[in-house]
Regions:
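Compositionally biased, intrinsically disordered low-complexity regions
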Residues: 6, 17-22, 89, 102, ...
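Acidic, histidine-bearing metal-coordination/catalytic regions of metal-dependent phosphoesterases
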Residues: 6-54, 184-217
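Exposed boundary/loop context
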Residues: 8-13, 74, 100, 153, ...
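Core catalytic region of metal-dependent phosphoesterases/phosphodiesterases
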Residues: 26-29, 33-35, 40-133
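Conserved beta-sheet core of the metallophosphoesterase superfamily
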Residues: 119-213
C-alpha cells in the first residue's frame, strides 16, 4: 500500500522479447544514454567514493554540466538509480536543469527519497527494465546480476550501485570479479561523472568480451 509520499510501482510492459520475456521498449541507439548513481545533493558520497569535489554544490554543478554537454533535449537517458537526495526543492532544481527524457530505474536510496509528485517528471519509473536498442537486448537494474539468462545469448546487463572506481577496495569489489563480460557499471564514478552513449557502452562491452575470450582460449 502507498504511504502517502510514494506511489505503488507498476512495471511498464510493452511488446514481447525473446522466448516470451517481457520487453519494455525498443529504441534508436543514436539518442540513447546510460548513467547511474549521480547522488545529487548527497554530501557524504564525496568522501565515501572519494569524488574529486570540494562540496556538494560543486559536485552538482559538475554532474549537470557533464550531463548537458553530451545529452540533448530530445535524447533518452536511462538512469539506473540513486538519482537525488533532499526534498522537493532539490529534486525540482535538478530535474529542471537536466536535458533529455529520463527513465528512472529505482535504486536503494530512491526508495526513501522519491516522492509521488516526481513520477510525472520522468518518462517512466520502474524497478527494472528489459529494452532493445538497435536490436541489442539490454537488462537494466540498479544492482549487477549474479546470473541472468541473457548472459548466454549476447544480451547485456547494465547496472550501478557498486560505485566502481580505480583501486576499488569496497565490500563489493571481490564480487565484481564474478560478473559476465556482457555486464557493465554505468555509474558516474566509473565513467568520468558523465552519461555514456549507447555506442560507448557497445565499444566497452565488445572490448570486455574480446578480452574474456582471449583469456579463456
Amino acid at each position: 500500500p502507498s504511504n502517502g509520499n510514494q506511489q505503488d510501482l507498476v512495471l511498464t510492459t510493452q511488446g514481447c522479447g525473446k522466448n516470451g520475456e517481457t520487453m519494455n521498449y525498443k529504441f534508436d541507439g543514436n539518442k540513447v544514454f546510460f548513467t547511474s548513481d549521480t547522488h545529487f545533493y548527497h554530501a557524504n558520497i564525496i568522501n565515501f567514493c572519494k569524488r574529486p569535489f570540494a562540496n556538494v554544490e560543486t559536485m552538482n554543478e559538475a554532474l549537470i554540466e557533464n550531463w548537458n554537454a553530451v545529452v540533448g533535449a530530445n535524447d533518452i537517458v536511462f538512469h539506473l538509480g540513486d538519482f537525488c537526495f533532499g526534498g522537493s526543492a532539490e529534486w525540482t532544481n535538478i530535474l529542471n536543469r537536466l536535458n533529455g527524457k529520463i527513465y528512472l530505474i529505482i535504486g536503494n536510496h530512491d526508495l526513501k527519497n522519491l516522492r509521488k509528485g516526481y513520477y510525472k517528471r520522468f518518462e517512466d519509473v520502474v524497478m527494472q527494465m528489459h529494452i532493445e536498442v538497435d536490436k541489442q537486448r539490454i537488462y537494466l537494474n540498479h544492482c549487477p546480476f549474479l546470473c541472468y539468462a541473457g548472459a548466454y545469448d549476447g544480451a547485456w546487463q547494465l547496472f550501478g550501485h557498486v560505485h566502481t572506481c580505480e583501486n576499488n577496495t569496497g565490500k563489493d569489489a571481490p564480487r565484481l570479479n564474478m560478473i559476465f563480460p556482457t555486464q557493465y557499471d554505468v555509474g558516474v564514478d566509473n565513467n568520468s561523472f558523465t552519461p555514456l552513449s549507447f555506442e560507448q557502452v557497445k565499444r566497452i562491452i565488445e572490448k570486455q568480451v574480446e578480452q574474456f575470450n582471449k583469456n579463456n582460449r
